[in-house]
Each structure stands twice: as structure tokens, then as C-alpha cells.
């Protein structure tokens, strides 16, 4: 089994918020920050061209290699889009301590930070995604999309 000390994957329902939160958490805890989506996009520069030339199956194999390579990182806080997390959840569970920063629907609707594009989730999709994350993460932390300091404090309080 992989040593998961100081290896955290941050997930949530609002990708832009999770990206910013992860960067802040990494800085605040003196850990390396990695956006998994950016790593995939950087590693596979011309995604559509690769798919057109080699097919979706080949692209998925390349993407899976990148996900597997995350095991080599240490002292890291990474973030990932919900859709990618769903696809590689089992593999990621063996690599990271996975933390779900839960935002309730009311908090999303009251979002004061315009820079976080709150996804237009209907109630059914919100409930399904929330349930999936709660069932597939090591820890769930309630958070406030409008209070980053509170979220950083909640993360510091967890013990693995």
C-alpha cells in the first residue's frame, strides 16, 4: 500500500473554487500544488488531434498513465475536476488522502465571489454528485465558498 502521508486530493462540486482552495491550502501548508487537469492538458498538448489520430482508447491509456504517475509525488495538495475524479476514483484512492470540501446548495446560490463560476447544477445532479463524493472520499469537510480562511482552518484541523 502506498504511503499517503502529506498527499491530499481536494475534490468538490465547483471546480474553479476547488482549484483556488487547493492552491491556497498548498501555500498555507507548505506543500506542492498540482492541478491534475492542467497536468493532463500539458502532457497531452493536442488532445483532439491525438483522439482523431489514435482514437479515444489510446487517449484514455495515456490519461491513465498520467493518473498513475501521481503516486510518485510527495508533499502535495492536488485538485481534480469532478468528472475526472469519477473516472479514476479507484486508482486515486490508493494514492491520496481524498478530501471533499462540501458546499451546500444555499451557499452556492449565495456565492459572493464572481470569479468562481458556480456550475448550474440541478437538484438531482447536485444530490447525486454530493452522495458520490461523500461515499468515495476519506473525509468530508463543510466549507463556505465565501470564507476561504474558515476553509483553511478546517483543513488544518484534520488528522490522518
Model-derived regions: residue spans:
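Short, well-ordered beta-strand core segments
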Residues: 76, 97-100, 139-141
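Phosphate-binding beta-loop-alpha motif at adenosine-nucleotide cofactor sites
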Residues: 135-151
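Pre-Walker A (Motif I) flank of P-loop NTPase domains
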Residues: 3-8, 74
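Short, charged, surface-exposed secondary-structure boundary motifs
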Residues: 43-45, 107-113, 151-152
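ATP-dependent small-molecule kinase phosphotransfer cores
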Residues: 32-91
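Glycine-rich phosphate-binding P-loop
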Residues: 8-26
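Short glycine-rich anion-binding loops that position phosphate/pyrophosphate groups of nucleotides
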Residues: 81-85, 104-106, 146
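A glycine- and Lys/Arg-enriched "phosphate-lid" helix/loop adjacent to the NTP-binding pocket
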Residues: 95-135
Amino acid at each position: 500500500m502506498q504511503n499517503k502521508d502529506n498527499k491530499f486530493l481536494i475534490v468538490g462540486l465547483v471546480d474553479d473554487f476547488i482549484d483556488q482552495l487547493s492552491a491556497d491550502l498548498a501555500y498555507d501548508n507548505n506543500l506542492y500544488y498540482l492541478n491534475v487537469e492542467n497536468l493532463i492538458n500539458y502532457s497531452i498538448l493536442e488532445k483532439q488531434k491525438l483522439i482523431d489520430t489514435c482514437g479515444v482508447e489510446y487517449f484514455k491509456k495515456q490519461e491513465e498513465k498520467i493518473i498513475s504517475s501521481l503516486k510518485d509525488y510527495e508533499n502535495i495538495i492536488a485538485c481534480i475536476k469532478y468528472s475526472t475524479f469519477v473516472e479514476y476514483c479507484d486508482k486515486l484512492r490508493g494514492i491520496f488522502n481524498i478530501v471533499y470540501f462540501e458546499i451546500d446548495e444555499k451557499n452556492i446560490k449565495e456565492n459572493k465571489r464572481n470569479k468562481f463560476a458556480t456550475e448550474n447544477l440541478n437538484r438531482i445532479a447536485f444530490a447525486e454528485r454530493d452522495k458520490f463524493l461523500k461515499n468515495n472520499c476519506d473525509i468530508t469537510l463543510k466549507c463556505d465558498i465565501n470564507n476561504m480562511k474558515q476553509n483553511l482552518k478546517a483543513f488544518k484541523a484534520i488528522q490522518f
